């Protein structure tokens, strides 16, 4: 879904939401593969922490994870204006986090195939 929304400046908040969902599901799939109970949380930093605690090191960027987390919270639970603190996410920002999520998906997919 996020890929279809990448080029529309009016839909960047929706794209950010779908990107977060994608990263969240990837992390949860990896946690499930470790035979752990998958927590009912949406916090990417906490999910990544669980993965790291089990000695799995991903080529991830915690700064981008934090940004995706922040955008998700603000798009899911917007303030009075319905915007994230910095305003509506730019297309460039959405393309950056989409590219990151796609790379992360491929990395986790390879780990799950082993």
Question: Which residues does each predicted region cover?
Answer:
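Terminal alpha-helical segments
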Residues: 1-114
